[in-house]
Regions:
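Hydrophobic positions on the alpha1 helix immediately C-terminal to the Walker A/P-loop
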Residues: 63-64, 68
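Inter-motif core of Ras-like GTPase G domains
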Residues: 151-154, 168-189
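P-loop/Walker-type NTP enzyme "switch/lid" segment
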Residues: 6-31, 35, 42-46, 54-58, ...
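Primarily NTPase-proximal linker/entry elements flanking Walker-type ATP/GTP-binding cores
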Residues: 38-49, 70-74
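C-terminal lobe/tail of nucleotide-utilizing enzymes
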Residues: 1-31, 36-37, 194-237
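Hydrophobic residues in beta-strands of the RecA-like P-loop NTPase core, especially within AAA+ ATPase
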Residues: 160-161, 215
Length: 237
């Protein structure tokens, strides 16, 4: 593994731009991502479960997951956003929600999961990570997690799952067999090519469907008003 990924609560304040806080160009970029995601599953019955991950930390995956979920809900889809990064949860801090009870508490059988409704949009529900467990990979790859996602498919058009970085811990690979696809976030001037290639290799070895890539944090110098800070690239076979 190329990057250490420690368990622990992040002591940070909300600083990401979310939903209506985004610039026009950023909103359009997420709308384009939303459209491409819909094309990735044209004939699938039931709700789609899509993971958002990266090769390494600090690529912007959590912010992308939140804004993708927002964009999908804004287009009149019923959407559930799940923070499944149990080691370094981010969604609760970004959206100023209580961390627990959340996903880990439900999977461990301690409490019912708390679904946050209407925080951003009426059609967007949010489940936070819950308390940091001693065994995240076991919980996230469990039969109980599969059953939970199968139930979510019946209630939502899309389930967006914020996942840990692939090369840091085994959690994303453990969950990959239960979801329909993974979008990989690649931050400009941050991710190394070899790490992205290794991420794809590991996901494909786990029989995960890599739907595409989001190239994030592109510099706007010299770019006119049509500049988009996020670009989507569909994976080609």
């Amino acid at each position: 593994m190329s990057t250490k990924y420690y368990s622990g609560i992040r002591n940070k304040k909300k600083n990401a731009k979310i939903g209506e806080e985004l610039s026009f160009a950023s909103k359009e970029a997420y709308n384009l991502l939303r459209t491409n995601i819909s094309f990735a599953f044209p004939d699938q019955a039931g709700g789609r479960v899509l993971g958002v991950s990266s090769a390494c930390p600090q690529e912007g995956k959590s912010t992308t997951a939140i804004n993708l979920a927002y964009s999908l809900a804004d287009a009149d889809n019923k959407v559930l956003l799940i923070d499944a990064d149990m080691r370094r949860p981010s969604v609760c801090f970004t959206l100023e929600l209580e961390m627990s009870p959340g996903l880990s508490n439900m999977l461990a059988g301690n409490k019912d999961v708390n679904i946050n409704k209407g925080k951003l949009l009426e059609k967007l529900d949010i489940i936070t990570s819950g308390d940091i467990p001693p065994n995240p990979s076991e919980l996230i790859g469990s039969q109980k997690m599969k059953d939970f996602l199968d139930d979510c498919r019946k209630k939502y058009d899309y389930v967006i799952v914020d996942l840990p970085p692939v090369l840091s811990v085994a959690d994303t690979l453990a969950l990959s067999k239960y979801i329909d696809g993974v979008v990989i976030i690649v931050r400009h001037n941050n991710a190394k090519r070899r790490d992205v290639v290794e991420t794809i290799r590991q996901l494909e070895f786990a029989n995960a469907k890599v739907v595409g890539f989001v190239y994030n944090k592109i510099e706007s110098k010299g770019v006119a008003r049509y500049y988009k800070p996020t670009k989507y690239y569909k994976k080609t076979q």
